[in-house]
Amino acid sequence: MHILDTRKKQILQYDMKGKFQNKKDINFWAIGMQLFNDSTSILYSGNQISQNQSYKFTIYNNIKQSVSGGFYPISQKKSNYLHVHNNTNFSKYGNEFLFYELYNDTIYTLTSTNCIPRYYLNFGASRIPNSYFEKDYKNIMEFQNEMSKNVFSYGISSLLNFHNNILLSYF
């Protein structure tokens, strides 16, 4: 069992009976974790740039208990204001891992080294124009106040993928 402690910036490991096994400091902000296999996990940092981390996704080697890389650079502009958390940002069915996030109309296939667009949700006139993400906001509240002046779909809040189907909800 792997537990991401966001506040302490640690990964805790327990056996399936709840006995503590190990603790590893990761020294950067991460809000989500997806276990790919026994040797690899992906840590998700959203748009939060840390001193030691500037990627949305960090590849973590579970065997060596160390970071082995990262991908999908965080936008400097979005790092100033776009900090939102979902309960989860991942869904797995079989060997397929999907990734999604708020304020995004795309569902991605996630591999241990890449994030590839898989599905696009056409929200039509309710889609957030890209120009909204290019403005300079001081914080998430300023951004959200601007969004609330419109009737936009804010993105996917939960997602489950199955063999021949996807179940999702969005705002």
Located regions from the model:
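Repeated scaffold domains used in trafficking and secretory/extracellular systems
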Residues: F28-F36, S79-N89, S153-S158
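Loop/turn-rich, solvent-exposed surfaces of beta-rich toroidal or solenoidal domains
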Residues: E146-F171
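Loop-centered beta-sheet repeat module
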Residues: Y55-N114
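Conserved beta-propeller blade signature
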Residues: M1-I3, S41-L43, E96-L98, I166-L167
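Flexible internal linker/loop segments at domain or repeat junctions
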Residues: N122-S153
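Short, flexible beta-strand-to-coil junctions
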Residues: T6-R7, S45-I49, Y100-D105, S169-F171
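Residue-level detector of Asp-centered blade-edge/turn motifs that repeat once per structural unit
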Residues: F36-D38, K92-G94, N161-H163
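Asp-box/WD-like beta-propeller blade repeats and closely related beta-sheet repeat scaffolds
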Residues: L4-K56, S66-S79
